[in-house]
Curated annotation (Swiss-Prot):
Catalyzed reactions: FMNH2 + NAD(+) = FMN + NADH + 2 H(+)
Positions of transmembrane segments: none
InterPro entries found in the cross-reference section: Flavin_Rdtase-like_dom, NADH-dep_flavin_reductase, RutF, Split_barrel_FMN-bd
EC numbers on record: 1.5.1.42
Name assigned to this protein: FMN reductase (NADH) RutF
Family: Belongs to the non-flavoprotein flavin reductase family. RutF subfamily.
Organism listed in the record: Escherichia coli O6:K15:H31 (strain 536 / UPEC)
NCBIfam families in alphabetical order: RutF
Stated role: Catalyzes the reduction of FMN to FMNH2 which is used to reduce pyrimidine by RutA via the Rut pathway.
UniProt keyword annotations, A-Z: Flavoprotein, FMN, NAD, Oxidoreductase
Broad class of enzyme this protein falls into: oxidoreductase
SMART domains: Flavin_Reduct
Induction and repression of expression: Up-regulated by the nitrogen regulatory protein C (NtrC also called GlnG) and repressed by RutR.
Gene name as annotated: rutF
An example Gene Ontology molecular-function term: FMN binding
Amino acid sequence: MNIVDQQTFRDAMSCMGAAVNIITTDGPAGRAGFTASAVCSVTDTPPTLLVCLNRGASVWPVFNENRTLCVNTLSAGQESLSNLFGGKTPMEHRFAAARWQTGVTGCPQLGEALVSFDCRISQVVSVGTHDILFCAIEAIHRHATPYGLVWFDRSYHALMRPAC
């Protein structure tokens, strides 16, 4: 069996563009958030998406206990917020950097996100270092922001959408 090494895999994955998201939660274990591009649709019946989260991440215990999350898809111009949530910045400073509303699950929704998916974690599957969180969508909030934000070739890029 031919095993692909980690660096080759990462280099190849940099060729796959992906939306930039801030994943948030709030509940009994507290408030937390992180930046993720490993998010995708699973099915529309029932509406479900998945989020991949490293079990070694400092936020993992909070998401694991709260069992709710909000996927906030970023707009162009929110790169600094993505960097803030992708680093070691304390949670209170991350959340202080933007306007948030509370979603139906109690999770923070980013006021200026392109779209927010408010979810309950319905199933968790562990693969390697990560948990795959299957998320049943309870509410969706779209915003009239004209530009999306993607991560491609290890940098941010803006995409203009033709209509909302």
